[in-house]
């Protein structure tokens, strides 16, 4: 039915053990998975995800090594299918939920990510959903929303102006709701790349590009002095 999908792969490493990988798609019957009872992967007969891998098994000499499974859900009026939960299993085959995605923005970008049931990270997007502009660890979306107010909702669809950039950093880094959070923020030149990154300590790293949009240098400012971290030089093949 879907001859373009990779179903089975065999690897012959140097130690001569036979490693096989099997892939399952929305039109396949999933194997029996220990530790979980739900069987609906959420894609159904979705025509836009025919090549999306739902589960992958890796075996060594036909013995299970690991397995990963993704459940999906619909966002943006259920028109867009995105990961809902990710499960992983070791050689015992018992699936454990390792990642959960409770919230997405209107562009289908993950906004809140929960790992291992307790480690929460919020990722905010802007530039009409094209780029992540903030990563807040050890915080929930509700806490971030309280810190930012209406900016949390308007940020994805806008363009990050200098004024919004200052407000975003100030609110995220000074809010009482985020006193235990680790905040990293990113500013971009659209269609070129990142131009500034501020780490959880409040230190900025800058990125500069040439007229062709290629990364020219990465630097920081220490004591008012520019300190290069990386410098790139581009030449044609025959250019000396």
Language model features: what each stretch is:
Residues 1-115, 119-199, 203-240:
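Beta-strand elements of repeat-based all-beta scaffolds
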């Amino acid at each position: 039915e879907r001859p373009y999908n990779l179903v089975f792969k065999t690897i012959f490493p140097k130690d001569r053990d036979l490693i096989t990988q099997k892939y399952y798609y929305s039109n396949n019957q999933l194997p029996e998975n220990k530790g979980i009872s739900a069987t609906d992967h959420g894609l159904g007969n979705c025509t836009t995800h025919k090549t999306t891998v739902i589960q992958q098994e890796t075996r060594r000499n036909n013995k299970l090594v690991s397995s990963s499974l993704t459940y999906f859900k619909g966002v943006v009026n259920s028109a867009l299918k995105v990961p809902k939960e990710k499960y992983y299993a070791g050689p015992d085959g018992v699936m454990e939920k390792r990642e959960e995605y409770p919230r997405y923005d209107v562009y289908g970008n993950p906004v809140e990510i929960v790992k291992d049931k307790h480690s929460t990270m919020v990722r905010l997007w802007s530039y009409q959903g094209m780029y992540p502009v903030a990563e807040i660890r050890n915080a929930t979306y509700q806490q971030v929303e309280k810190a930012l107010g209406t900016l949390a909702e308007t940020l994805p669809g806008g363009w990050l102006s200098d004024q919004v950039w200052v407000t975003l950093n100030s609110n995220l880094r000074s809010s009482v709701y985020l006193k235990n959070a680790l905040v990293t923020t990113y500013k971009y030149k659209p269609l070129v790349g990142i131009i500034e990154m501020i780490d959880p300590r409040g230190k900025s790293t800058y990125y500069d590009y040439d007229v062709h949009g290629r990364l020219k240098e990465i630097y920081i400012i220490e004591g008012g002095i520019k300190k290069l971290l990386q410098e790139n030089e581009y030449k044609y093949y025959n250019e000396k």
